[in-house]
Amino acid sequence: ILKLIGKHFSEETPLPCTAECADVKACTNYGIPSAEPFDTTLSKRNHQANCVIGALAPSLYQDRERLATVLLCNILGGPASNSILNSVLREKNGWVYGVECGYTQFSDTGLVAISLGCDKSNLDKCLTAIDKEIAKLQNEPLSDRKLKAAKKQLLGQLAISSDNGETQCLSMGKGLLAYGKVS
C-alpha cells in the first residue's frame, strides 16, 4: 500500500493545487468560478422524485468563506431535525422523505448541494419552498440568538463526530494532502 501511495504522492510529485494557487481575488463572485447553469431530468419508472440542486462554493483554501459555508449548510439542511429545510419540507408540510444540504471542498473550488426525495407530485412545491427559504436567508439576517444557537449546535456535532476514528483519519488525511501536515 505504501508503495502505491508513494507512486502518486511522492515528494517529487506536486499536489495538483496548493493554498498559494487559490487566489480569491483573481476570481469573480467571491472566488467562486462561474459555470453555466443546467437542468437535467431523467424519467424513471417509480413514484419518487430524487432531486439535487447544486452551486459552486468556496474552495478548501478560502478559510473565511469556507467556514461560513459549513455553518450555512448546517443551518439550511444539516443532520439535525431543526434544520430549516427539514422543518419546512418534512415536519411542517410532509412533502419529503428526506432532505439535506452538504458542502464538499476541493482544492480549486467547492460544491454545495441540496438533495431531497419526495413524491413526484410534491417536487414543484418543494423547489418553490427551497427558493423561498434561500431568499429569506439572503435578505433577512439571522438573529444573534439563532446564529449563536446554530454555531453551538455545529460545534456539538463536530465534537460528537470527532469521537469516530474513521472521521479522525479522514480529517488527518485531508490535512496532509491539502496543507502538508497533520494537525
List each language-model region with its residue ranges.
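Conserved phosphate-interacting/catalytic interface
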Residues: 80
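A generic local secondary-structure boundary/capping motif
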Residues: 28-31, 39-43
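Flexible glycine/proline-enriched surface loops and loop-helix/loop-strand junctions
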Residues: 34-35, 67-69
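Active-site palm subdomain of RNA-directed nucleic acid polymerases
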Residues: 84, 89
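Charge-rich, well-structured scaffold segments of protease-associated domains
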Residues: 1-23, 41, 46-51, 57-60, ...
